[in-house]
Amino acid sequence: MSVPVVYDKRRNLDCREEKEESNLAFVSQDEQDSSSFTILYEEPLQEEDRYTSAELRGSQSLLFPDTSSMPGLACERSESRTDLVHHFEKEGKLGEAFDGDNSEMFLSVEAKRYKIYPLALSPIYEDDSSQEDVLSSEVSPGHHGSSKSRESANQPSSVLSLLQSVSERLQRNFDGDDRQEAEEEEEEAVASGKDWRTEKREHVTFHLPDPSIPFYPEDNQEHAGIFKSYVEFSEPTTSSLQHGRWSEKELFLQKSDMTSKLHSSLKSAYHQYLQTSRTHSSETGTRFGGTLQEPVSKYFRVQDHAGRLSPYVENVDKQTLKCNPRPGKMIIYDLHGSKYKQEVYCNIPDATTWSFPNGALIKVVRGCWILYEKPHFQGQKCVLEEGERVLDRDWLLQNRKHPERNFVLGSIKRVLKDCSIPVIELCPKTDPGCSPIYIHRSVPNVEELNIPKSTSVTVKSGVWLAYPDIHFKGQATILEEDQGLFEISAAEMKSLHPLQMGGLKVEMPMNLKVILYEKPHFLGHTKEFSEHIDSVPTFLKSDKDFHGIGSIRVIGGVWVAYEKEHFKGQQFLLEEGDFEDSSACGALSGPIMSFRYLQANFIESSITLFESSHLESGKFIDITNQEISDLEEIGFGSETRSIHVKSGVWVAYHQKFFCGDQYILEKGKYKCFFDWGGSSNTILSIRPIQLEPLGINEPTHLLKAFSKAGFQGECIDFVKECADLTSFTPASFKVLRGCWLLLYYQEDGFYHQCVLEEGLYVDLTSCGCPSARIRALQPIDYVFEEPSISLFALEHCEGRELHLEDAVNSVLNKDLHFYTQSVWIKSGLWIAYEGSNFLGRQILLTPKEIPNWTAFSGWKTIGSVRPMKQPAVYIRIRNRAQDEYLTVTGNPADARTMSVCISPYSGKDTQIWHYCRGLFKSKASHTCLDVIGGRDTPGAKVALWTEHGQLRQKWRMSRNGTISSYLSDELVLDVKGGNYYDKTHVIVNQPLEGEETQKWDIEIL
């Protein structure tokens, strides 16, 4: 996520003071582009986890120090390239940067040197150890010490020594000049009677990885990334539910007014936290999922007073929250290759007839579920949250003693239907007069609550898991609502975790279909539609037997229901799934009067909220691919007066925790609350609608063909090529997945092509072939490279050249007037049109050379040309040699700790990617594959970094399975191999014939 911040830059010219005021400096964008030096920053070499914990214990943050106590936070502009190096050599004693409480962050005998690149560049990690700097003789399995590895072995150490010698010389040469310059400027300032500090201001943008994604290590700690722990005390004067997540506090607000002060833009939860954390510097914090978790013992004691709780809590009346119901969905696949599956949307009292002899892969799309061993929700239980999980027959304890038994599934129950706040009550039995504690979020260590060992537990709302070990380890006990009082000993409840629903999702955005039922629970007469309905009474008027809407089933797409006709009034989002009665659409005060479907890029979402009614002015916040449950807690405020949706579809809520009235926000600008359908400026929470990857055995291409126009008549699904359509004549199409090539012939007797991209084609005219007979349908393979094409004025790709990377609606216009005679398609897929403005006959162009365009196409020349719009899809990248997947490891909240390696299939977001603009972007961290330091040398490691679009982040996949870097065609993705700890890490290497570790397969999700 990119969060711009305005900093007040002050250059300290007083060289007589020996106290160092800053350890970091940032360079302006102009100097970033031209600077050949980097910032040197010392940091502990080993045990990075110890470093992060020490950083958390300190009362100040390295990146966000307390501005009141550190006036010299230097976002300084270096006067020259050498001045920047000199400045950091001069401030080598990192332990003096902050007070004594913070010095432990930096004190280390063994130190590691990092290169911190300017904001648009990726980091270079240079280790003093020989294992890191000198490339292993086993760069990848089977190399066995190739000559190219040995030649580059000494490069890092030589570069490091060269930089060190240069910095020492610069220090000697410029030390005297720097002091003299400082004294002169100080004398001028004193003479003028003004402050000797020179104030500068610059707009700096920090690129922060998305901190909301918890990282799960490779062990069996399924909930190791859960970091949400808050409680509420039952004192009548206060309600201590704290709304926001700590990860959301990593957002910063920004002031577009360049004359505002630094502290005015930092008066948020961060500033308050830094102020209050000083009083607790002696206590140790806990880190979960890379996000700071304050010691629960500080403010979760029953004896604490309301005044002491006030910095950490917020008065909220849970009863006033109006929860929005949501549908559930779970898909059960056969474990070993069979295409058999079962889709579950509601409770299944008896599932014993379902056959999964080898086990099942269960994908929970939405909601939380409980599997039972026996019918009617009896027997052993298994809790499932959103995500994938493999279950074999051993999920039942008794089956482990009887290997001959098959996989058993008795019944299924859905336990969460909205985003309501979970509440569990802990009441000490030894002290009846003591106030009970109400917990709302995960507690990794219940012992830190300092509650008696003998405690009674009551679940007020939601479903909770009680673990016998801290940090959510061991066999959990399921605690459900309305099941009375639980008597649990301290040994059985060391940590607590509530089940919670995930974000808004859509699986098949183009598969638009809704079925209306006359009665609740999907009974009575039905009506279905797949287009906008601006008036439900008019739509139902033709069916006299249909008397109102009792229940709704959304087959595909994401829809909005409106309280009034013509898409006005209150709004309610309809996700894919079942809405069994009117309470499922309880957000609307009246019946549904109109429906509308939503279309957008659901992979990348970006929005800006403004506190001013004038766009691009005042305080605002940028949000990318992240949901925020409490905008007030991050310091933005409760009122939003204008909105700019840059991409995706967002849902804003009138209340916190995604409760209350909903406002659907599509791409565009909203200048006041009337524009988004609100009754006031109040918006307290917001979240995007995101594309959900499909499960295993789902088709990568899907097209629905209809025998009549307007999606009427007989319907046939196509998932692969059909070479003969003589027995079925399609008249309209729904292209749901992938792109397709339609082959047809007209009266001239020649075959022609027509490309169908993802979308809806109500008739053949919308396809581009109004009077034609369709003969064949062919899916078009996905490509993972940026499009590039060259048109030539002479045959055989000679003469004047017109190079294109984007669409041109007229090649023959007065500006270009290019008469194409030959074509060289360098990369990507292109569509050539005979006429201008993408009209007329079409031809799909794949990478090759066409020496004579007229002989190839039968056209005189090209009228217009554009790249084919490949649909946005999620993918997994599998290494052929190791049969393992490209995986993100480390903490997504800290780019320095993240690395890229290969590991076995896990089903987690850390193995899911998507390709756009030449970038492979991780779904877990929203960062890109990046060659560390941009070194175009074999053996350079590949890491993750925020998108900056430079060549080191761009990749293309060739047809032979190699993934090459835009830095050089002679650099391809490889696995390092060898016997060291980093043997599974990914590097770039020279392409070698027959080297299977350099071959990758793309799995479309």
Curated annotation (Swiss-Prot):
InterPro entries, sorted: Beta/Gamma-Crystallin (IPR050252), Beta/gamma_crystallin (IPR001064), G_crystallin-like (IPR011024), Ricin_B-like_lectins (IPR035992), Ricin_B_lectin (IPR000772)
Gene Ontology MF term list: carbohydrate binding
Classification via Gene3D superfamilies: 2.80.10.50, Crystallins
Listed SMART domains: RICIN, XTALbg
Domain Beta/gamma crystallin 'Greek key': 367-416, 462-500, 512-556, 557-599, 605-647, 648-690, 701-737, 738-781, 828-869
Phosphoserine modified-residue sites: 122, 129-130, 136, 140
PROSITE patterns linked: CRYSTALLIN_BETA_GAMMA, RICIN_B_LECTIN
Keywords on record: Lectin, Phosphoprotein, Repeat
Residues covered by region (Disordered): 132-159, 173-198
Record domain Ricin B-type lectin: where: 871-1003
Residue spans of biased composition, Acidic residues class: 180-189
Organism superkingdom: Eukaryota
Disulfide bonds, paired cysteine numbers: none
GO biological process, one term: eye development
Annotated family: Belongs to the beta/gamma-crystallin family.
The protein's name in its UniProt record: Beta/gamma crystallin domain-containing protein 3
